[in-house]
Amino acid sequence: LNKELPDTIADNISSIGDVEVVDNAPDLVHVFGKWSGTTATTMKGYTHKGIPVVFTSANGLVDVLPPHSLMLAPTVFHCCGPAEAELIKKLLPKASVKVIANEQFTLTTDRTTMLRQFNDLYAKVYSEHEAKVMSEINNKVRTLNISDHAINEICSQLLYLQYAFRRETIRQRLLDNLSDTLINSNYDEESMRQALDTLKISSFATSVMALLESKSHLTEGFMPIAASDDKTTKQMQKHII
């Protein structure tokens, strides 16, 4: 792995597709590092928040992984060649692996092709990650066994907002969409409160109502549960983008 690859991607990827390199609030992180405890800790920090990780090993092929490397849990391993990919699959059979050749070391690709492949990889990883998150949310909502579409939709949006809070990235449109849904929906308030209790998000919902009142356009009359401007509300305010 040449040291210039991360800079090549960061400096040029935005010209290929929709990927934008950011310093804060990433949707996906590409980690370049050695098989080490430090790398493991870095990746676990992102995956714990629910941020997908692509990992490129900076020290290439290794015959035996040290014990701490078993902690490594990237969403996808990027390898520069098939030999490295085969070794990863041998050591970690369940790993998701993608081979993208480094244009600095082979004539089988060029910079534009390589960047396009990384762009497509990032888009695919993010899309699949979001689909998995939504599937998990839908499964939780289905456990309510409620036919009221409005309650199901509101609970789904609250659960996604809870996930976004864990990622420390709350987009303003999420708040505005939830405000709109609450304002334009008719539902049984008692059933709604029971649903929030069943999902164990009643406390979180009270914090969200205060957030929507201060940072979006929701008013008290459209709240399914009383607002509470508490510590959680203040923490969420810090992560609105």
Across the structure, where does each feature detected by a protein language model lie?
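Conserved NTP-donor binding/palm subdomain of two-metal-ion nucleotidyltransferases/polymerases, i.e.
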Residues: 117-241
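A short, active-site helix/loop in glycosyltransferases that binds the activated sugar's phosphate group
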Residues: 72-96, 106
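A conserved, positively charged/aromatic
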Residues: 61-75
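N-terminal subdomain of nucleotide-sugar transferases
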Residues: 1-21, 51
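Short glycine-rich, flexible loops that bind phosphorylated cofactors or substrates
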Residues: 36-38, 62-63, 86
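Short N-terminal targeting/anchoring amphipathic segment
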Residues: 20-38, 52-58, 168
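A charged, aromatic-enriched C-terminal amphipathic alpha-helix characteristic of glycosyltransferases
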Residues: 101-122
